Amino acid sequence: MTALPANTSTTEHTSGHLAGGVLGLPSVLFCIVTGAAPLAAMLFNVPVATLGGGYASPAAFIVATVALTIFSVGYIEMARRVTSAGGFYTFVSRGLGRVPGLGSGLLIAVCYVVFSAAVLGVMGYFAATTMASLTGIDLPAWVYMVIGLVLMSMFAYFHIEFTAKVLGVLLIGEVLVLLIMAIGIFAVGGAEGFSLAPLNPVNIFNNDAAIGVFGTGAAGIALFAAFWSWVGFEMAPNYAEETRDPHKIAKTATYGSVIGLGVFYVIISYAYVTGWGLTGSATAVQSQFAGDIASAFYPLTDRYVGSWATVLMEILIVTGSFACAMSFYNTSARYLFALGREGVLPGALARTSKRQSPAAASMTVTAIVALYCLAFVIYDPSTEGALLKLGTWSPLLGVLGILAVQALVSIAIIRYFLTSGKSDFHWWTTLVAPLIGFAAMAVACVLLVANRGDLSGAADAVYIEILPWVVLVVFLIGMAVAAYLRSSAPDRYARIGQFEMTEPADPGQQTEKTTGAQA
């Protein structure tokens, strides 16, 4: 189909299009997997999962891997037919209509911006503590947050391929240091030898396994922490316009990131439990959350590999957090770019640099992230606040919004294929798998809302109390804007979620026409 015209002013470098054909499969994988931040995910989410599931935390990662793989089945079918930087926003618009589509688009854009700020706070905390530990230079976390945001803005201006290479180098370092730790543990059998009990999903709900802080077990916390570790895997379609073969790469990158991360997470979480022992794994987590140790992973690395590996891990958690923040930054910029290109948000957001990167949207993200971080720094200027407030509270908002939109995407996939008149409707890929995906995402949302007080460590904080309502209000604002445009600006309303690449990247795949999904 021909791309719908964008309602935007242009400069000599503005095309309303991103640079096409510049990303291969490795580059897209780097952009996706760094969003999941494997090192940060393991150092933070494995202990959280252990709080709820005890030594069965590896089983929680197995359950999440299976659930997200099933969700990906229908998601990939949709991505093969809809190629746009809008990702979830475009999918919901095509499947459920423009009104819920814009609600999803605004919500997911807000969530990714919040994630960028949250992970920037995590990076600031670890940069400050690591620098103080290694050099004696004691600066507040916000100094490193400013440096990180400036660097992200600079990288965003350059070609996306350059950014992908930076992300790739940092990602490889994260994976290697965790694998070195795991090999060191497995080589000697850990503290008590090997056991299959941590890999049995039944034990997630077994009170005898949950010997952590909650005593009687909180399976919801264990499962939520596992799902949390994959946030970012869904980014592949957002880079579709910039890939050489969007239909093939979206499928391979999504499956590769979900299954690859799943196997990796299970290995590392199992190494953690094996290294400490079934009982010791929970005891170490208690020490971490009591503030006695910076991470339950550091003593393990010291014991089974050596202090040099621990120092390397401390450095890589800083660079890995930066890479994660940059990945979310890039994706949030692409959502704002897509919304600006279609005339929903100010058209200036669709302006690109001479390298065809979403320059205006990126600078907008920079400004929003800066203001959001500033609010938290004013609330709690301490270095610990960067982690315990900004870096812990904000991801709960981001994860809840993303899980809610993923649930909507599952329903959108089903309706899209049921109403499109296509012969490629399949009982498994476009019906049963999305239904299972919807159920999994809905359950994860309920678990987050029910356990948000324990997960944040600040059940009485206003931010935590109103968190579900913030997600709902943002979604409703997006829907209200779409409803307003439907009556006052039909031409702009018609563009919601309908932009697509002018030419299909795969000559054998017919590009989907605008179906005029109604809402």
Role assignments for model-derived ranges:
Residues 1-46, 51-56, 69, 73, ...:
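Membrane-interface "cap" regions at the ends of multi-pass membrane proteins
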Residues 14-21, 58, 136-140, 169-314:
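Helix-loop-helix junctions that connect adjacent transmembrane segments
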Residues 41-141, 266, 466-479, 486:
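Extracellular loop-to-transmembrane helix junctions
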Residues 84, 107-124, 230, 235-243, ...:
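Membrane-helix boundary/coupling elements in multi-pass transport proteins
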Residues 90-91, 97, 129-133, 253-326, ...:
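TM-loop-TM module centered on a large, flexible mid-protein loop between adjacent transmembrane helices
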Residues 90-94, 99, 121-143, 172, ...:
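Helix-loop-helix connectors at the membrane interface of multi-pass transporters/channels
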Residues 142-200, 231, 253-260, 401-404, ...:
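Membrane-interface loop-to-helix entry segments
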Residues 392, 396-405, 428-519:
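A generic transmembrane alpha-helix motif of multi-pass inner-membrane proteins
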